[in-house]
């Protein structure tokens, strides 16, 4: 897949194996991995539990590299970046720092929300107050730290804390911040100094992604025009310098979006949001150095809140719904036609590998399923976690890593 090019390009002077799950969404930032040897069904009691341990508040995904897991959690008034042995769950190192939640909205927990980024021998984390920390991934030594809200005055402060996971491109780390002149910024991974800052949009809780349009790398992000009646939009930028290449309207209530956009090799980009907008598909083409954006369809019945969207073939699968029921939905990326909607799980996130979906629903169920245009089939299911289990699972080889707001666990899902 073309997306794999980006992670190869961003390795900063490091040879050898790349991280197995280096960032939000996995190697290609699309919740699809190339794992083989996965079981076609689980025993009655569920897959073998390798270990389970207490962790703490937070929705950070679990990043993985060379037998070590990296994530974040909250302990009282502190945020904690933690590294754990993938085989045992034992702590290898952790780093705690003060991060008062203050007057931010607490009803869904205090975060942290972002996923650690692994790059070479370093790991990068961002907390609810937009503190970007760089650690030696082996020792946990803090190498440098940046207060993004302080460094970029007027940056968008989200009601539930900063939640946009960073992405790496070539020799830079790119973050959406919001604000005049610095809607999107790029920093040097070595020391955090500013490489570029561009554009005048507001930020949202969602994370950016990288695509390639006819040979040109582009950063895609959901941004907004700010103000009390924020108007959301999808933006394409040059990740080399932040230059704005194109925008397309995608209005949502409060100018918010959380779900990661989905890109296909056919040039179709799909963005789906809760908060009133639904899903929208854009066909991107490029000629004469200019990108042309054509809206293919819009469908308000596909409203993905904070869960994952996964494209397999010509269909995208995701839970559609805001704060009520969220039926599992299959939508044709070419036409916007809803093929089916079924209440198979509560609101759920998943990762796809070897023809199977590994599902974590918000009530704590962990499932093995097959999804196709013909419908959904739950093969196996076990109750393991507690509500709200909103973190997407991580799959590395035949090991599935899952968490909720109290615990983290490792499961063996191989044959």
Task: Locate predicted features.
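Noncatalytic, solvent-exposed loop/strand surfaces
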Residues: 15-415
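Hydrophobic h-region of N-terminal signal peptides that target proteins for export
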Residues: 6-16
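Positively charged n-region of N-terminal signal peptides that target proteins for export
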Residues: 1-4
């Amino acid at each position: 897949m073309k997306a794999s090019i980006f992670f190869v390009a961003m390795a900063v002077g490091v040879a050898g194996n790349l991280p197995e799950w280096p960032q939000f969404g996995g190697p290609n930032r699309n919740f699809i991995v190339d794992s083989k040897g996965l079981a076609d069904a689980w025993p009655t009691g569920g897959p073998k539990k390798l270990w389970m341990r207490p962790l703490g508040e937070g929705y950070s995904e679990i990043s993985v590299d060379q037998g070590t897991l990296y994530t974040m959690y909250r302990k009282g008034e502190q945020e904690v970046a933690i590294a754990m042995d993938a085989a045992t769950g034992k702590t290898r190192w952790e780093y705690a720092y003060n991060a008062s939640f203050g007057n931010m909205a607490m009803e869904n927990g205090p975060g942290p929300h972002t996923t650690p980024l692994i790059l070479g021998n370093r790991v990068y984390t961002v907390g609810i107050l937009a503190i970007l920390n760089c650690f030696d991934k082996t020792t946990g030594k803090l190498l440098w730290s940046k207060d993004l809200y302080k460094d970029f005055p007027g940056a968008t402060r989200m009601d539930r804390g900063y939640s946009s996971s960073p992405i790496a491109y070539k020799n830079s780390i790119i973050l959406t911040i919001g604000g005049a002149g610095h809607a999107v910024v790029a920093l040097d991974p070595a020391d955090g100094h500013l490489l570029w800052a561009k554009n005048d949009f507001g930020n949202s809780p969602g994370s950016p992604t990288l695509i390639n349009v006819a040979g040109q790398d582009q950063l895609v992000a959901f941004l907004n025009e700010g103000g009390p009646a924020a108007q959301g939009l999808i933006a394409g930028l040059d990740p080399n310098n932040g230059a704005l290449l194109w925008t397309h309207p995608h209005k949502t209530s409060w100018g918010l979006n959380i779900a990661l956009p989905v890109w296909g090799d056919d040039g179709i980009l799909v963005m789906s949001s809760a908060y009133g907008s639904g899903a929208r598909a854009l066909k991107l083409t490029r000629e004469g150095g200019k990108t042309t954006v054509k809206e293919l369809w819009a469908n308000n019945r596909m409203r993905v809140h904070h869960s994952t969207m996964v494209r397999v073939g010509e269909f995208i699968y995701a839970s559609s719904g805001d704060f009520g029921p969220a039926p599992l939905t299959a939508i044709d990326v070419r036409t916007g036609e809803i093929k089916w909607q079924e209440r198979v799980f509560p609101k759920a996130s998943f990762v796809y590998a070897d023809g199977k979906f590994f599902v974590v629903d918000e009530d704590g169920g962990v499932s093995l399923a097959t999804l196709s245009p013909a419908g959904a089939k739950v093969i196996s299911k076990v109750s393991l976690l507690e509500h709200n289990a909103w973190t997407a699972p991580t799959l590395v080889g035949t090991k599935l890593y899952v968490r909720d707001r109290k615990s983290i666990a490792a499961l063996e899902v191989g044959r």
